[in-house]
């Protein structure tokens, strides 16, 4: 599934609204993922506290949302732009790529809850396609 020019514009515009609160959105989405999909906790076993709002979750949000913001900037070449990050996830972190979809879903829910006016159906579809493309790019080095 490829992103159209309109999709890219919608994603960039929406990210412009979100980026000022990206840390809060990341913490909420990561906390949500750890509660709704408890199997993902295995990747964060080194954290002393995995509960939503804990310091480790707050720290993890910066990594995740920084990567999302970076991906928005590389929206025209996600595969090439996220190649190094894909390599880290595949070889060093050994994260099951199915988990990218789980986090993407939690991000979508978080955006919908926090931006009910801005996160229209059209924006939702564009951001969903974008996150699916990011997930595919991150999974590329698993092959």
Swiss-Prot record:
Pfam families: Globin (PF00042)
GO cellular component, one term: blood microparticle
Domain Globin: 2-143
Residue numbers binding O2: 59
N-acetylserine: modified positions: 2
Binding of heme b, residues: 89
Gene Ontology biological process terms in this record: hydrogen peroxide catabolic process
Family matches, as PROSITE patterns: GLOBIN (PS01033)
Keyword Iron: yes
UniProt-listed CDD domains: Hb-alpha-like
SUPFAM superfamilies in alphabetical order: Globin-like
Other comment: This fish has two types of hemoglobin: one cathodic Hb and two major anodic Hbs. The cathodic Hb displays a small normal Bohr effect and a reverse Bohr effect in the presence and absence of phosphate respectively. In addition, the cathodic HB displays a large phosphate effect.
Family classification: Belongs to the globin family.
Subunit structure, as described in the record: Heterotetramer of two alpha chains and two beta chains.
Designated name of the protein: Hemoglobin cathodic subunit alpha
Organism, as annotated: Conger conger
């Amino acid at each position: 599934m490829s992103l159209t020019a309109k999709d890219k514009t919608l994603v960039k515009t929406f990210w412009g609204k979100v980026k000022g609160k990206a840390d809060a959105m990341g913490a909420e989405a990561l906390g949500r993922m750890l509660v709704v999909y408890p199997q993902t906790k295995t990747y964060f076993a080194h954290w002393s506290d995995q509960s939503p709002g804990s310091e480790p979750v707050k720290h993890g949000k910066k990594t995740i949302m920084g990567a999302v913001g970076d991906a928005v900037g590389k929206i025209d070449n996600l595969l090439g732009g996220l190649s190094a990050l894909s390599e880290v996830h595949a070889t060093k972190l050994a994260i099951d790529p199915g988990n990218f979809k789980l986090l993407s879903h939690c991000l979508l829910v978080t955006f919908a809850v926090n931006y009910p006016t801005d996160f229209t159906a059209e924006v939702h579809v564009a951001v969903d396609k974008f996150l699916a493309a990011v997930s595919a790019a991150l999974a590329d080095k698993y092959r």
